[in-house]
Amino acid sequence: MNKFFITTAIDYPNGSPHIGHAYEKVLADIIARYRRLRGDEVFFLTGVDQHGQKMQQTADQEGVNVATLATRNTRKFIALWEKLGVHYDGWAATTDELHKKCVQGILATLHDQGQLYKKAYKGFYSVRQEQYLTEKDRGEDGHFGEEWGEVIELEEENWYFRLSEHAEWLKSAVTSGALGILPEFRRAEVLNAIERASETDLCISRPKDRLHWGIELPFDTGFVTYVWFDALINYISFAGYRSDESSSLPDFDTLWPANAHVIGKDILVPAHAIYWPCMLRAMGFTDDQMPILLVHGWWNIRKKNTGSEEDGSEEKMS
């Protein structure tokens, strides 16, 4: 019996689930069902990304505790997957203690290996994307595009991952197919993005005086982990990576690598095609242990009254 490990992106429960969330989960569920019918041993992992600045901001706006917000909205996602008959085998929630332990263990190892360093930063920051920006992120008109949302100026000290050290390897992995990317035409998009990775390291922390809702750095308690660094690790933390023998999680060595990370085109670059493979390599994963990225597009909703189309990401579902 062949194993088949399929994941989806974990959803951000700062709001209600929408058609984009549903499309991705149903797509992954169809693939998982097909593989089960073929006789494969399937492990289908999905879940929620409960940390980060947007969660903290939404909780503040609603006047509720952020943990309460995370629990309340997570229930909405679970209820929808039950309603749609999505049959997953593993559930990832980033506030789970086993995930926290795994993330902190990885951070400690990378810190000990010299893959993380601390430096001061002064520049621009996208609140929507929760990431720092460079001049290359400006449009031809000299402004930051709408995709970045609110952009503010920041000056603060943070911890960084030596992403740039892995850029040449990443280019080779994408070109050779060691990092699988489907459909094939998405590969060119990734290769174009690697140039920036060769020049910029990844900020993997946020100071607690600005963001308290996250996983604390084990070697510097004044900081929490950047939400993407935290979230990406769910693909291995809930698949048994670094778990003890008494754990009910799968056998990681048998399960990994993932046969399909099902993700939207908006989070291919930089998160899944730049950050994630470089993180894996820094952890000691080899070329033949890299996952396959299965990238889907978006739904457009046609308005009956105007005939115009808009992104379906705001079409709420219940």
Give the role of each language-model region.
Residues 2-39, 43-46, 98-102, 147-318:
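Structured secondary-structure scaffolds
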Residues 36, 82, 111:
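Anion (oxyanion) recognition and catalysis
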Residues 48-54:
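Short, charge-patterned binding micro-sites
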Residues 51, 123-129, 295-301:
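A glycine-rich phosphate-binding loop feature that marks nucleotide/adenosyl-phosphate handling sites
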Residues 58-71:
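A charged helix-plus-loop insertion that forms the helical arch/lid used to bind
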Residues 73-89:
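A glycine-rich helix N-cap at a beta->alpha junction
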Residues 95-115, 125:
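Feature captures the FAD/FMN-dependent oxidoreductase FAD-binding
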Residues 113-171:
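Cys/His-rich short segments
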